[in-house]
C-alpha cells in the first residue's frame, strides 16, 4: 500500500484583508499539513499547485517553506509538486530551486515512482496554449499511475479544461488525477479514473465557508481510497443580518454579539431593508469585541429612485477587483500589466519602467500573450475562484539569488503545530482503470 497526502492551493504569502496575522495563518496551515505527514506514516506529500499566492514571495514566506520542506526531507518524505497559475514565472520557478536544493521534486512528463505508484505532473497552462499540448508521458512499469494537475477541470463546477480529452489523448492509463486550483474539495469517477480536488488549506475568500483541509489517498492493488482530512484554522464568523424597515446599526451590533468573535475573521452580510448602516462602524465594533478583522457585505436592494439604499463594501476588495478583471476577458499581457500596476511590491516610481520592460519582453518572447482571452459568462465569472495569471517576465537569476539567500538563512526548526485530522467520508473507489490523462511541464 502507498499512502500520500494530496494538498494544494496553500497560497503562502497571502496577506488577506491586509492583515499580517492572516499571512501567518496561511503558513501555519501548510505547517500543519507537514506535521500531519510526519505523524501519519505517509509515503509522500503531493502538492497540486499554488504553493504561493503570487510570483514574488517575500523572504519570511520562503524561509517558512524551506523550514517545512527540510522537516519532510529529514523524515525521508518526498515533496512532489507542480506549478500553479498564481506562482508561475516566465523564468525559473521557485519549485525548480527547491528541487536543486534537494527538498522537492517537480513532476512532469517523466515519472517519479513512490512505492510502486508512478506520479506525473501537469503545470497550469493558459487556455490559449492548451491546443499545443499532446499529453504524452514516459510510460513506466508501475502498479499505479497518477497525474497531478492544476486547473479547472471537468466534471466539476466552472470547468474550462476537459478531463476526458486529456485522458483520451494520453499514452498513460491513470488510476487517479489529483487536482488543484478549485478551492472546493470534490471527487468524481470518470471511466474508472478517480478525479479529485483537495481544496485549499486556508480560506482564501469569504465564500469558502466549509472547513479547510486536504486529501489522504491510499493506493492498493485493488482500489484507490480517497479520504478527507480537516485542518484546524483560524475561525471565521459568518454573521447574516436580515434588517426590517426600522432597524439599523443597533440590530447589527446585537446580532454580531451572538457570535464568538475572539481572534476570528468576521464577515457580516446585510440583507432585507432597514436604515443606512456604515460598514466602518460595524467593522470597528467587531474588532472592539475581539475580532481579528471584520468586513461587511451589504446586499440590500436598490431603492425606487435607482440609488443604492445603503453604503456598500466588499468582504475582500482585492478579490472583487480580480473578479471584475476576469470578467473583462483581457489578454495574458494585459493581465500581467494590471498585476504590475496594482502590485504593492512595485514602488509607484518604478511602475512605468516595470510595465515597459514586461511589454517589451512579451513582444519579443510571446506575441500570443496580446491575444484577448475568451470572455466568460457573467455567471461563470461570478463563481469562479481562480484567475489565469499571465506569465511573469521576472529575471530567473534574481529568483535564484533570492531563493538561495533564503536557503542559507533558513534554520531547521521543529515547529510545534498540530491539526485536527477528522476523517470525513471516503470515496468508494473502484479498482478498474480504462482511460487516462496526460501532462505538460
Swiss-Prot record:
Its EC number is 3.1.-.-. The active site is at residue 86. Mn(2+) 2 binds at residues 50, 85, 150, 181. The keyword Cytoplasm does not apply. Pfam families: Metallophos (PF00149). It comes from Haloferax volcanii (strain ATCC 29605 / DSM 3757 / JCM 8879 / NBRC 14742 / NCIMB 2012 / VKM B-1768 / DS2). Residues 360-441 are annotated as: Disordered. The gene is mre11. Signal peptide: none annotated. Disruption phenotype: Mutants are more resistant to DNA damage, but recover more slowly than the wild-type. PANTHER family: COMPONENT OF ATP-DEPENDENT DSDNA EXONUCLEASE, NUCLEASE SBCCD SUBUNIT D. One of its GO terms (biological process) is double-strand break repair. This is DNA double-strand break repair protein Mre11. Residues 379-403, 411-425 have a biased composition (Acidic residues).
Amino acid at each position: 500500500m502507498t499512502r500520500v497526502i494530496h494538498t494544494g492551493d496553500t497560497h503562502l504569502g497571502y496577506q488577506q484583508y491586509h492583515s499580517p496575522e492572516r499571512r501567518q495563518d496561511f503558513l501555519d496551515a501548510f505547517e500543519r499539513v507537514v506535521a500531519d505527514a510526519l505523524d501519519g506514516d505517509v509515503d509522500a506529500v503531493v502538492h497540486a499547485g499554488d504553493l504561493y499566492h503570487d510570483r514574488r514571495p517575500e523572504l519570511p514566506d520562503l524561509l517558512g517553506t524551506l523550514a517545512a520542506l527540510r522537516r519532510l526531507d529529514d523524515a525521508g518524505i518526498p515533496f512532489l509538486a507542480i506549478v500553479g497559475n498564481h506562482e508561475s514565472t516566465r523564468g525559473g520557478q521557485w519549485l525548480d530551486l527547491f528541487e536543486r536544493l534537494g527538498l522537492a521534486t517537480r513532476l512532469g512528463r517523466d515519472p517519479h515512482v513512490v512505492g510502486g505508484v508512478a506520479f506525473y505532473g501537469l503545470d497550469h497552462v493558459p487556455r490559449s496554449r492548451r491546443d499545443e499540448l499532446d499529453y504524452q508521458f514516459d510510460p513506466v512499469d508501475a502498479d499505479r499511475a497518477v497525474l497531478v494537475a492544476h486547473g479547472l477541470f471537468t466534471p466539476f463546477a466552472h470547468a474550462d479544461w476537459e478531463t476526458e480529452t486529456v485522458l483520451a489523448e494520453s499514452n498513460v492509463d491513470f488510476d487517479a488525477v489529483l487536482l488543484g486550483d478549485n478551492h472546493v474539495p470534490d471527487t468524481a469517477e470518470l471511466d474508472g479514473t478517480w478525479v479529485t480536488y483537495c481544496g485549499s488549506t486556508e480560506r482564501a475568500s469569504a465564500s469558502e465557508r466549509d472547513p479547510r483541509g486536504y486529501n489522504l489517498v491510499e493506493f492498493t492493488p485493488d482500489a484507490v481510497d480517497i479520504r478527507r482530512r480537516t485542518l484546524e484554522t483560524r475561525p471565521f464568523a459568518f454573521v447574516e443580518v436580515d434588517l426590517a424597515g426600522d432597524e439599523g446599526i443597533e440590530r447589527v451590533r446585537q446580532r454580531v454579539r451572538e457570535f464568538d468573535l475572539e481572534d476570528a475573521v468576521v464577515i457580516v452580510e446585510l440583507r432585507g431593508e432597514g436604515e443606512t448602516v456604515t460598514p466602518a462602524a460595524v467593522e470597528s465594533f467587531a474588532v472592539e469585541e475581539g475580532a481579528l478583522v471584520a468586513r461587511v457585505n451589504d446586499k440590500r436592494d436598490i431603492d425606487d429612485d435607482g440609488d443604492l439604499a445603503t453604503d456598500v463594501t466588499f468582504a475582500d476588495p482585492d478579490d472583487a477587483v480580480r473578479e471584475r478583471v476576469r470578467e473583462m476577458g483581457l489578454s495574458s499581457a494585459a493581465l500581467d500589466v494590471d498585476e504590475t500596476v496594482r502590485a504593492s511590491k512595485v514602488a509607484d516610481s518604478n511602475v512605468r519602467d516595470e510595465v515597459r520592460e514586461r511589454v517589451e519582453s512579451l513582444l519579443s518572447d510571446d506575441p500570443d500573450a496580446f491575444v484577448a482571452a475568451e470572455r466568460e459568462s457573467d455567471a461563470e465569472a461570478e463563481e469562479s475562484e481562480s484567475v489565469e495569471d499571465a506569465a511573469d517576465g521576472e529575471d530567473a537569476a534574481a529568483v535564484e539569488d533570492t531563493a538561495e539567500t533564503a536557503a542559507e538563512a533558513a534554520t531547521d526548526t521543529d515547529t510545534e503545530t498540530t491539526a485536527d485530522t477528522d476523517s470525513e467520508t471516503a470515496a468508494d473507489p473502484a479498482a478498474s482503470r480504462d482511460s487516462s490523462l496526460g501532462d505538460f511541464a
